[in-house]
Amino acid sequence: MAQPDSSGLAEVLDRVLDKGVVVDVWARVSLVGIEILTVEARVVAASVDTFLHYAEEIAKIEQAELTAGAEAAPEA
């Protein structure tokens, strides 16, 4: 059997840390129409620099959503 190529694994790990991987999970379990479990998770695997850039972009998106929601709300 051939040994796994450690340089290939190192390259994959380097790319994952450089680019980052985000796994976004949403699941709901219901029994007879009654929700018994909801799972929401976001897992990020990245270098600190990549994660900070990702967090900044997510904050911009959330701020834009809040601004759009405030503009759409009718004034009293």
UniProtKB/Swiss-Prot annotation:
Variant or mutagenesis effect after changing residue 40 to A: Greatly decreased interaction with GvpF1. No gas vesicles
Q: Coiled-coil stretches, from where to where? A: none
Beta turn: region residues? 32-34
Give the result of residue 57 to A, as annotated: Mini gas vesicles
Consequence the record notes for mutating residue 54 to A/E/S/R: No gas vesicles
The region called Alpha helix 1 is annotated at 9-19
How does biotechnology exploit this protein, per its UniProt record? Can be used for presentation of peptidyl epitopes in the mammalian immune system. Purified gas vesicles when conjugated with 2,4,6-trinitrobenzene sulfonic acid (TNBS) yield trinitrophenol-modified gas vesicles (presumably most modification occurs on GvpA) that elicts strong antibody responses without the injection of extra adjuvant.
Effect in UniProt of substituting residue 53 to A: No gas vesicles
Main localization of the protein described in the UniProt heading: other
One Pfam match: Gas_vesicle
- Organism's domain of life? Archaea
Gene ablation phenotype (knockout) = No gas vesicles are made.
Effect on the protein of changing residue 7 to A? Normal gas vesicles
List the residue ranges of the region (Binds to GvpF1).
1-22, 2-43
Which parts of the sequence are annotated with region: Beta-strand 2? 35-43
Q: What induces it?
A: Expressed as a probable monocistronic transcript in mid-log phase. Expressed more highly than the gvpA2 (c-vac) transcript at mid-log phase. Maximally transcribed in late log phase. In 'wild-type' cells (probably NRC-1/NRL) gas vesicles are seen at all stages of growth; in standing cultures, cells float. In this study gvpA2 (c-vac) was not detectably transcribed, while gvpA1 (p-vac) was transcribed at high levels during log growth and decreased in stationary phase. Presumably most to all gas vesicles are derived from this p-vac locus.
Could you give the subunit structure recorded for this chain? Major component of the gas vesicle shell which is 2 nm thick and consists of a single layer of the protein. It forms 4.6 nm-wide ribs nearly perpendicular to the long axis of the vesicle. Modeled as antiparallel homodimers. The ribs form a low-pitch helix rather than a stack of hoops. Interacts with GvpF1 via its N-terminus (residues 1-43) in early growth stages, none of the other GvpG1 to GvpM1 proteins were seen to directly bind GvpA1 in H.volcanii experiments. Might interact with GvpJ1. Might interact with GvpG1, GvpH1, GvpJ1, GvpM1, GvpN1 and GvpO1.
Q: Which NCBIfam families match?
A: halo_gas_GvpA, PRK09371.1
Q: What else is known?
A: The 'chromosomal' gene (c-vac, gvpA2) is only expressed during the stationary phase of growth, while this plasmid encoded gene (p-vac, gvpA1) is transcribed constitutively throughout the growth cycle. Encoded in a 14-gene plasmid locus called p-vac which produces predominantly short, spindle-shaped gas vesicles during all stages of growth.
What this protein is called in its record is Gas vesicle protein A1
